[in-house]
Amino acid sequence: MVAEVDSMPAASSVKKPFVLRSKMGKWCRHCFPCCRGSGKSNVGTSGDQDDSTMKTLRSKMGKWCCHCFPCCRGSGKSNVGAWGDYDDSAFVEPRYHVRREDLDKLHRAAWWGKVARKDLIVMLRDTDVNKQDKQKRTALHLASANGNSGVVKLLLDRRCQLNVLDNKKRTALTKAVQCQEDECALMLLEHGTDPNIPDEYGNTTLHYAIYNEDKLMAKALLLYGADIESKNKHGLTPLLLGVHEQKQQVVKFLIKKKANLNALDRYGRTALILAVCCGSASIVSLLLEQNIDVSSQDLSGQTAREYAVSSHHHVICQLLSDYKEKQMLKISSENSNPEQDLKLTSEEESQRFKGSENSQPEKMSQEPEINKDGDREVEEEMKKHESNNVGLLENLSNGVTAGNGDDGLIPQRKSRTPENQQFPDNESEEYHRICELVSDYKEKQMPKYSSENSNPEQDLKLTSEEESQRLKGSENGQPEKRSQEPEINKDGDRELENFMAIEEMKKHGSTHVGFPENLTNGATAGNGDDGLIPPRKSRTPESQQFPDTENEEYHSDEQNDTQKQFCEEQNTGILHDEILIHEEKQIEVVEKMNSELSLSCKKERDFLHENSMLREEIAMLRLELDTMKHQSQLRKKKYLEDIESVKKKNDNLLKALQLNELTMDDDTAVLVIDNGSGMCKAGFAGDDAPRAVFPSIVGCPRQQGMMGGMHQKESYVGKEAQSKRGILTLKYPMEHGIITNWDDMEKIWHHTFYNELRVAPEEHPILLTEAPLNPKANREKMTQIMFETFNTPAMYVAIQAMLSLYTSGRTTGIVMDSGDGVTHTVPIYDGNALPHATLRLDLAGRELTDYLMKILTERGYRFTTMAEREIVRDIKEKLCYVALDFEQEMAMVASSSSLEKSYELPDGQVITISNEWFRCPEALFQPCFLGMESCGIHETTFNSIMKSDVDIRKDLYTNTVLSGGTTMYPGMAHRMQKEIAALAPSMMKIRIIAPPKRKYSVWVGGSILASLSTFQQMWISKQEYDESGPSIVHRKCF
């Protein structure tokens, strides 16, 4: 197939010009200007061009594209031909080219199929059915390729060879599938033809079915064992062939049948690459739905996407891109593992704790801030002794915040829970308790400072302003809170630092001189930009001067103030001790929280480990469960096999019981029925002669009401019908030994069981006889009627000639059986009839009766009615004989009247018979008397012997057995001896055996066979019929 290029019109499907038609692809508009725009190629429509024309065109039009010449492949215009396109000549003109002069008679009949069935049977009798013509074609090849199912069925019945190959190594099944003759193909499959035989191109029957888009035939081939992965010489499986030929429906069918999507042709191309090269977006989409590998490369190292890009198949490129994106998303979703996420969370948690030890972020709290006015005195004390408390402040700061995370005192663990998840309430309550203690202390100090040094309204105003600024700062500069736990206010931390500094100053024995000044300076210095400690406004102007008398008062006041300061200092020390105690408790709480956090991390790691152990345990349990299921299935299969074997044993026991129940006494003895064309003979096995012998005729009233005073019946059988022949229409249900009217034949059997033998057929096994060349359909119909209509418990069908041979005590010989309707010559070797040497002659007693009526009519005697015909038959059986030398007998009768005989008719009239009594049987040896061109009975017997194997001819010559009522004429054995001796080799010994009771020899042979102890193993039981149907008669009755 040639790839479709989006920017160019589709290539034309017109046949290619020049001698390259069978080798090159389709022509496109790059090659001929006349193709452009129309999409069709007009070159080559008027005939092939010569080489000079091709060279001229080539020189004018420049480079040829890869659709036209293999030398242009790889130019980038089409990727299909990068490795060479496939030769589709195997699929071109599937039917045979037949010339009449090349075929013989049988092959012509098989090809045309316009031959009568009986003529075709005669052809098959004289011709080898497996004969091949010049092109190695058999009759089965020709009939299958041309759809002559009737001929095919007849050839299969003749057991012709099924897997014969013609000159292209194709079987008859291959030709039937290739020519889409489904009926013939199904018949061949049912008879066991191998569907996997490749032809010279490597194609099997499934390849041709896929090429023809015949899904029903492909399904049938797969049911009969066709290989779905067979490859032809191009490396194409049926799936690759369907993709290459853009057969979307059969490709979809093969995908459902689990065809290998990753199979490669001889160039390493997958089905996807072939679909891309062929430009079939629908097949590409169908293959992508099956998750096919899109990254596979052919032998040139190119992928399907590269072919699509180079061929400008934009739709296919988009399909491949979308498929790849879906695969990437699927892979990314599969790679996300919950256990791995939890592990990463634990690692991040540990790194966060490490970071909290090195850096302390600014704390935030939801608790109300401590009033800043209450801190001013402590802050002034801090400024006064600034040089002595730096280390202590650092230690205190580090001690308070030890173990803090990024967000405050109690860091929040990173997990899948919401960010506002809180720690347990006991930790939060402990923290709140510490903060309340600090608040109480500040409230105690705040009234003193606020009453002496500040204006309440001004302080409240300043506090509100500072609070609003702090909130703005927290909104703009503070990091996002990870916890809702309360944090210690910065002012509270600063107050603790101040008290620690005062205590340090006590230890070093600081002087009291300048304390107020230092305190004042510390307060002034502490007034920073953030306005935590605003300066107190003096009520006197700065430039105000005090007199000297007031100066002394000032010093006395200063001493009082100093004394107050010492008192306050002592109170501060007491408070400092309490704060240290609370601080230690706070550190303990933080350490406890850290230990609990590490414990929770450890628990998480333990949970992860336990989770992985549980997963492994679940996997082991699943594996154990699968093992148990598999073992259960094996045990179930074994139990079913045991049940099946026990069932078979029980069936065999039932069969044995049924056989044992059928004892050979008069009540359940085997019924033997010989169905002849003229007479029906019936009786019980083991008897010397049949108990019932009656004509095989059925009579129906000619008009309703003709038998009005009598008990009128719809039909009459046998002697009763013969006695009423004047008012009945008589019919013979058998013609030339073959049953033609099954309704009348069923009436004869019913009459045999209930009127002649007076037995119930459902209580007796039955042995029926048949003609040697009885059709298979007749055998099956006979079996069906016995089992379904008469419900017989068992039955067997035997060939009449074999039973005649058994009567003479032989198992090897040739039987010439001539009855009322047909004559057969059947060679038998070691108890087996030879069908290829069996011959049939439609000349017997009925034809002799008609001939005798004719010659008597020439003498002036008229016999026209059925009753008169019976009179003629009686004359034939009582007076006629076979002349040893016909010419001599004719001369004797002409010269003397002493050989004439008289016969009295029922009405008293006497007729005279001269040469008619030996002229009538002479027609058996000279059928030309009757206007027939066939051979006589002696030549037919000789021809059967000659068709047999050379090694057994001697046994046949010495064991020639006569059978049937027509062989009862006196002189028959001597005439046969004389005629066959004249035909056989001079040194060959001839022996004709003519049993005295040969009129009933067929029935007697059946009686002998049915009385054998081994006969029970030969017959067909009702159970076997129910299991296999009527076709079982072909397997058990040979």
Curated annotation (Swiss-Prot):
Residues that span the membrane, as ranges: none
Region of interest (Actin-like), ranges: 666-1038
Residue ranges, annotated region (Disordered): 332-493, 507-561
ANK repeats: 135-164, 168-197, 201-230, 234-263, 267-296
Coiled-coil blocks: 605-661
Pfam families: Actin, Ank_2, CCDC144C
Entry keyword set: ANK repeat, Coiled coil, Repeat
GO BP terms: axonogenesis; cell motility
Domain of life, source organism: Eukaryota
Basic and acidic residues compositional bias, start-end: 340-355, 364-387, 429-446, 458-493
KW Electron transport (keyword) present: no
Keyword Repeat attached: yes
GO cellular component: actin cytoskeleton; actin filament; axon; cytoplasm; extracellular exosome; extracellular space; membrane; NuA4 histone acetyltransferase complex
Biased segments, Polar residues type: 448-457
GO molecular function, one term: structural constituent of postsynaptic actin cytoskeleton
Gene3D superfamilies: 3.30.420.40, Actin, Chain A, domain 4, Ankyrin repeat-containing domain
PANTHER family assigned: ACTIN
Family, similarity comment: In the N-terminal section; belongs to the POTE family.
Name by which UniProt lists this protein: POTE ankyrin domain family member J
Organism annotation: Homo sapiens
